[in-house]
Amino acid sequence: MKYLLVEPKVKSIAPNIALMKWATWCERNNHEFEYVKGNIRPSIQPDVILMSCIFSFYSRKYGETIRHYRNLFPKAKIIVGGAFPSNMPEWFEQFPYVEIHHGLSEEIESLPPKYSIDKKNKKIITYASRGCVNKCGYCTVPKLEGDMKSFQSIKETLEYGLKEIPDATGVVLYDNNFTAHEYFDNIVDELRDFGLPVDIHGLHVSDFTEHHAQRFAELKWGAQHENGTAYNRFSFDFVGYEKHVKRALELSEKYKIKAGFFCYLLFNWKDSPHDFWKRIILSQRMVDEVGRTVFLFPQRFEPLNSLERNNYIGDKWNDDLVRGVVKLYTFMHGFIPLTTTRNIFRWIGYSYEEFLDNVIKFSTVRGYRLNKKSGEPPSTDSLY
């Protein structure tokens, strides 16, 4: 059998781990395979086409890719998997020749990814767990992956990854909630002993304890970015998380974890602009009290069934406010850095009224970004 592994050409910050695992499956079962990205003409004549579809708002691109390969190989079996078809199988009914794979395959999940199919990737990217203990209303994980399943060891995957990428620069875990991992200590031991810089996604502030901080201090951080920048990624999605966020920040400083403190700020969901602004202010207060920089990354909410990106406006928001917030953090190169100097607030606003005023003005301007040489934002005079 010949398998064509298709990754649609959409914006992505990481290689497609699912297709890498399928490549390993093909190799171990003596099936010929080819991995492609985008709508091209592959070198093989496939019997089966496996396609990964993650985000619903790329539906148009996915449709184009399905039609492209159907036209090239009308006799091939087409199977699509991922979050989008698992959440919205009805959308794929327009393609009666397409078979949908729902959720995760235990057989495939147990395999290490074949990293070498992506020649540009230099990181060992994997999971130490799937699923999550939480059931957040804005997240697809509970439906796609189910209850949390912790893997007792990732040593085999790490060693396999190093064989695939001898010059690997780091290890990245894309877990949803690593702080709730059943075998947390064992995984940290393996990461520490492996020796490469690490980056771990999915750290929940409500689960973060002194023990987590102590163990994280043992790790070498900085796998995600080529310049060695490292972050511990938390989220501050609701004002009620304040005490948890502050506790995590205090522990990070106490144990001198060598990674920046990074917080996602969900907005445009059930929150209001005032709620969003208040989380920024509360974060700054924590910075002042603890003395550790916090990097805020606003995350615009997208409904799980959205077929187009950036069209949804929350009940308590409007288009100008959402667009202004997006431009505000885009102009700061993607995040809002909070330091004890408070310099950033002359750009954001020192009161809620100033914040609203600046956000509305940001929604109408173009071309401003943080000055890379000086590290200072442009004068707010240029926005008036």
Question: What feature does the model see in each segment?
Answer:
Residues 221-384:
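A structural motif corresponding to the C-terminal lobe/cap of the Radical SAM core domain
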Residues 17-18, 119-160:
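Canonical Radical SAM [4Fe-4S] cluster-binding loop centered on the CxxxCxxC motif
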Residues 26, 132, 136, 173, ...:
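Conserved, mostly hydrophobic/aromatic
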Residues 5, 154-269:
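Conserved SAM/AdoMet-binding glycine-rich loop
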Residues 46-50, 98, 137, 169, ...:
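Conserved acidic residues
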Residues 22, 61-69, 157, 186-187, ...:
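A general structural detector for well-ordered alpha-helical segments in enzyme core domains, enriched
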